[in-house]
C-alpha cells in the first residue's frame, strides 16, 4: 500500500499542512505496521523525509508536524533550505539534514557544514574531501557507506568487495565518523533479496566497526521490505510530499515523471525523506 499526497498546486498553508499531516500519519502507520510484522520496535526506525524539489515551506511544515530528519540530494537546494530553516536552530529538536544523493568532491565542503548525516560515501576521494570539509567546519560528520547492490556504476555505491577498505578509510579520517551503510534496491529486481544482502554486509561491517549500526534502505514503494531486513532509516519522498514534477531531461527513462530519485542521464540515485519514529541519525 502506498499513500500519496496530492500534488501541491499553490495550496494555502493551512491546506498544505493538513495534506502533509494526513500523509505523515499514513506513512507513520505503514512503518509501525512493518515493524510489528517483524517484531521490531518502531522507535528504532528513523523516517527521513526527502524534500527535494519541494519548497522550504514544506520542510518547515513537516518540522512543525514533528518531522526532525529531512533529506536532500543536491547541495545547492539542501544548503538553501538549511539556511532558510536556520531560525529553528534554537528549537529543542532542530532539523537534522541528511544528504542522500550522489556527492561530487567539489560540493563536499559545503555539505560538511550543514549535514547531520551523509548517506552516500562511496569512494576514497570523497572521504578525503569530506574530512577536509568537516575539519574546516570544526565538526564531526557521521557518514554512511553507499553499497552497490547491482553493480551499475551510474547509480553509485562501492562494490561489496571494496566495503571493508572504504570503511577503514572513513574510520581513520579525521573529522568523520563511520555510522553504517546505505543502499538503493536494484531497478526491476527483487527488493527483499537486495536488502537481505545489505543486511549481511551491514553485519559484517559491525563485526569490525561495532558503532557502525545504521542501515539506510527503503523508499516510498519498498519501506516494508526494508524494515523487515533491518533498516534503521527509511527515506520517504513521494508518499509524504506527493508526486514530483521534473523538467524533461535528456536520458530520463520514459515515464519517469515521478521517480523517487533519478540523477543525470536517467541514473537513479538515492531518494530520501524523513521523520524520526524514535531513532536518530
Model-assigned labels for residue ranges:
Residues 2-221, 227-229, 241-246, 252, ...:
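Conserved alpha/beta-domain cores
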Residues 255-269:
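C-terminal accessory extensions appended to soluble enzyme cores
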Residues 224-228, 236, 240-247, 265-268, ...:
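Expand to "…catalyze enediolate/carbanion chemistry for C-C bond making/breaking, isomerization
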